[in-house]
């Protein structure tokens, strides 16, 4: 027997509220549990990482490279300025070193060369007495170049000359110059001795970077010799002068050169011929054989990169004034046949 029980509206409302409360309580418990989990995750922290090496140094003129970790030495030359610069002065790179003290010492030596004994140094002046005597006979460019050649990152330590490295396979010395016409480097050929490769680098540096290029040997050896009436006699006189210390080792090794390809030899000879005609000493010793030159030497066409150089005067990279400065001394040695040969190319 069933008894019908009438449920009033008030009871229905109470039932609904109780169900709603129970649902809210369950939801609240879930949210609180989630919040507890989130808070626990926030408290988890990874192990502290090693701080990156500081780029600054306690020594003047020294910074640490962010990638290689080597210490680089720089000097600010306040006296250097040209119209293309927005501020006076330029940064002079002195090389990268494995040891911080070595970079600081390189800065001290460069500062002594630029500004003398009264400049501020990293180490006492008494440590550099012998170096001061050595640097007196060199120009700023020569001495800065010698400092860079002693750095840890220069030419992989295989040669004391700039732009020279030893070939891994044949043992000969190869010369390269970097950042030419947008290329990473320009290959200049291989040579029997370091000095020959260094001269090839100097020639290319003067050709592509002008008279301010940093060279291995004094730039006056290539461009600033007076125009002689008799180049052979003048060369013989220069061999006996104290400034001709390059003569014993710039003679080419003809037997070893026979192993090189004909195109590579012509490239090297023509590049040397182009800029060394103004120097009787170097022209005779590097290009010509030990016997007197023939009256009518064989003609050779200029390689492609030098042809491009003669044709790029209007390209904006080289002005007419720069071209005159570099090649102005060569006009007295060039015959009309020389220009006609260039036009035929």
Swiss-Prot record:
PANTHER family: AP2-LIKE ETHYLENE-RESPONSIVE TRANSCRIPTION FACTOR, AP2-TYPE TRANSCRIPTION FACTOR
Keyword RNA-binding belongs to the record: no
Gene Ontology biological-process entries: ethylene-activated signaling pathway; negative regulation of seed germination; positive regulation of cutin biosynthetic process; positive regulation of fatty acid biosynthetic process; regulation of growth; response to abscisic acid; response to salt stress; response to water deprivation
Assigned protein family: Belongs to the AP2/ERF transcription factor family. AP2 subfamily.
Disordered: annotated span: 15-62, 243-302
Described purpose of this protein according to its UniProt entry: Probably acts as a transcriptional activator. Binds to the GCC-box pathogenesis-related promoter element. May be involved in the regulation of gene expression by stress factors and by components of stress signal transduction pathways.
Entries under Gene3D superfamilies matching the protein: AP2/ERF domain
Organism: Arabidopsis thaliana
GO annotations of cellular component type: nucleus
InterPro entries: AP2/ERF_dom (IPR001471), AP2/ERF_dom_sf (IPR036955), DNA-bd_dom_sf (IPR016177)
Keyword annotations: Activator, DNA-binding, Ethylene signaling pathway, Nucleus, Repeat, Transcription, Transcription regulation
Organism superkingdom: Eukaryota
Record's keyword annotation contains Cell inner membrane: no
UniProt-recorded name of the protein: AP2-like ethylene-responsive transcription factor At1g16060
GO molecular function: DNA binding; DNA-binding transcription factor activity; DNA-binding transcription factor activity, RNA polymerase II-specific
Cellular compartments annotated: Nucleus
Residue ranges for the DNA-binding region feature of this UniProt entry: 58-124, 160-218
């Amino acid at each position: 027997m069933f008894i019908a029980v009438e449920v009033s509206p008030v009871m229905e409302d109470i039932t609904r509220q109780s169900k709603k409360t129970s649902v809210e309580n369950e939801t609240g418990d879930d949210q609180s549990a989630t919040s507890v989990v989130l808070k626990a995750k926030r408290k988890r922290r990874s192990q502290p990482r090693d701080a990156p090496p500081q780029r600054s140094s306690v020594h003047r003129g020294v910074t640490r490279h962010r990638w290689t970790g080597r210490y680089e030495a720089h000097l600010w030359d306040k006296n250097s300025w040209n119209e293309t610069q927005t501020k006076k002065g330029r940064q002079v790179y002195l090389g990268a070193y494995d040891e911080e003290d070595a970079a600081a010492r390189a800065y001290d030596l460069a500062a002594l060369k630029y500004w003398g004994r009264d400049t501020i140094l990293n180490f006492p002046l008494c440590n550099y007495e012998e170096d001061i005597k050595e640097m007196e006979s060199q120009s700023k460019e020569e001495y800065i170049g010698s400092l860079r050649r002693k750095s840890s990152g220069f030419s992989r330590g295989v040669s004391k000359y700039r732009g020279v490295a030893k070939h891994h396979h044949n043992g000969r010395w190869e010369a390269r110059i970097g950042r030419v016409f947008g290329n990473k480097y320009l290959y200049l050929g291989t040579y029997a001795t370091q000095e020959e490769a260094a001269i090839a680098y100097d020639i290319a540096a003067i050709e592509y970077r002008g008279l301010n290029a940093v060279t291995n040997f004094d730039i006056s050896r290539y461009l600033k010799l007076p125009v002689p009436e008799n180049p052979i006699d003048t060369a013989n006189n220069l061999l006996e002068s104290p400034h001709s210390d390059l003569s014993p080792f710039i003679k080419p090794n003809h037997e070893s050169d026979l192993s090189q390809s004909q195109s590579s030899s012509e490239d090297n000879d023509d590049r040397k011929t182009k800029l060394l005609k103004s120097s009787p000493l170097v022209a005779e010793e590097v290009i010509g054989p030990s016997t007197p030159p023939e009256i009518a030497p064989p003609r050779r066409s200029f390689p492609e990169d030098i042809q491009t150089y003669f044709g790029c005067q209007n390209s904006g990279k080289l002005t007419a004034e720069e071209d005159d400065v570099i090649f102005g001394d060569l006009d007295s040695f060039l015959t009309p046949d020389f220009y006609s040969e260039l036009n035929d190319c």
